[in-house]
Amino acid sequence: MAAQSYYNGAYNSPPAYEQHDHTSDQFNRVSPRPSPSPVAYNNAPYYQSDDPHDPNSLRYSQQSIGSDNGAYVAGGRINEHDQYAENIPLKSANPYGNDHPPQPWMQQPTHYAPDPGMMEPQVPMRQKKKGFFQKKIAYVTYILTIAQIIVFIVELVKMGQLTGSPIQTKPQFNPMVGPSAYVQINMGARYTPCMKNVPGVQNATQQVLFPCPNATTTDSDCSLSELCGFDGVPNPHPGGSLDDKPAPDQWFRFIIPMFLHSGFVHIGFNLLVQMTMGADMERMIGWWRYGLVYLSSGIWGFVLGGNYAGQGEASCGCSGALFGILALFVLDLLYGWNDRQNPWVELIIMVLGIAVSFVLGLLPGLDNFSHLGGFTMGLALGLCVMRSPNALRERIGLARSPYVAMSGGVAAENADPDQNKTSTGSNIGGLGKFNPKGFFAGRKPLWWAWWLVRLGALVAVLIGFILLIVNFYKYPSSNCSWCYRFSCLPVNGWCDQGNLFSR
């Protein structure tokens, strides 16, 4: 009965859709037709509608990343109080700001950066200077150049006062276009009779006279002391011997001639090389290395010339010192041979320059022995004071920072000042902080082998210098009877100018 009354009750058939009250059901309400977006999505990809029924609203959007080529909008819940809003963040809008997005991983470079320790140190950029001070000032080069110019002006003035002309024209013309050799001797050129007893002077059987500094003829009217100048030297007397005491002892003629020059051609060529190649080398290796090689090469050259050149030949000029600097350029080329773009071209240019200089050394007033001696000393000292070859530094794991350790070089001026503050050791003569224990610790066998080469070069030049000095003062004349021809041309009697006695 109950079941029959239920199925046969007032509701014999279910109510129609139209008979249902839709206003009271908040979950089954028919949503109004969504209104179109005010702008197309393709034209405004970041447009966000406030209407939740907008198909472009973020409430109903999960755009396909793979199919959408446009910019991605910010997904996720916009209204935190809307329980039906999606909260799945896909991608933030414009994550790179104004920068470009990174390349795909397949297009990114795969090579690794080189080891910083094996690279040349980066020189920090400084504010560029204009004019004469654009580069680092080569103080030693400029001081030497100024001194040599002043001395040459004094030579010309003295020559003009003594002879009436600053340039020698009588009894013969000076091919270097400058003062006579007698004025140069009087001002300190290397002249063997003013430095020691020589055959044909101290052991002469009759009085020996020399040309005067003001001579314009071939006459000899002055004594040796008047020609040598300064405080004078003991004059030889007839019937003397090579053992006479006191003997001439103007040893400073091994040093002073570096500041004297025999003419405009001589000083012009030397200063051109000195102000270009010399200044560049000083900037590269530092003032104290440059000054050491310059002075040592010049002195060594005059010592060698005093032993083997003609004893009656006067010699002056800084050519020997410049040949020592040229030797440093040769070493620098050989050290970095594989790093040079055209090493053979540079070597050929250097060889040609050396050959031309030796040809000029055959002219009066110049000395090829000074050139040879200066070049030899430059090579030996270069091995001692310059950096190691690049190939050796790479094998023993040293960075290519040549001249920072003891300052004064091209890398030292750009060195980090904080690094100098933190280094330990003693500051010797302002040359930089040096820590012997840390310097020699952990060195490899190749490093020690190269330092043995350096030590051998230093010992060799010291022994050679001592032997040449002893030989110069021990033996009155050279044991090589033909060596003097290496420094003169047998024309116009040039080789006879050095003859004080018959050979």
Curated annotation (Swiss-Prot):
One GO cellular component, as annotated: membrane
Location, primary (coarse class): membrane
Residue stretches of biased makeup (Polar residues): 1-11
Keywords: Hydrolase, Membrane, Protease, Serine protease, Transmembrane, Transmembrane helix
Catalyzed reactions per annotation: Cleaves type-1 transmembrane domains using a catalytic dyad composed of serine and histidine that are contributed by different transmembrane domains
Keyword Protease: yes
Record topology, Cytoplasmic segments: 1-136, 275-283, 338-342, 387-449
Residue ranges, Extracellular side: 158-253, 305-316, 364-365, 471-503
Pfam families documented for this protein: Rhomboid (PF01694)
EC numbers for this chain: 3.4.21.105
Record's bilayer topology term: Multi-pass membrane protein
Location of region: Disordered: 1-66
The UniProt record lists the keyword Zinc-finger: no
Locations listed in the record: Membrane
Location of the active site: S319 (nucleophile), H371
InterPro entries hit by this protein: Peptidase_S54_rhomboid-like (IPR002610), Peptidase_S54_rhomboid_dom (IPR022764), Rhomboid-like_sf (IPR035952)
One GO MF term: serine-type endopeptidase activity
GO biological process terms held by the UniProt record: proteolysis
Transmembrane segments: 137-157, 254-274, 284-304, 317-337, 343-363, 366-386, 450-470
Family, as annotated: Belongs to the peptidase S54 family.
Role noted for this protein: Probable rhomboid-type serine protease that catalyzes intramembrane proteolysis.
PANTHER family: RHOMBOID-LIKE PROTEIN, RHOMBOID-RELATED
Protein name per UniProt: Rhomboid-type serine protease 2
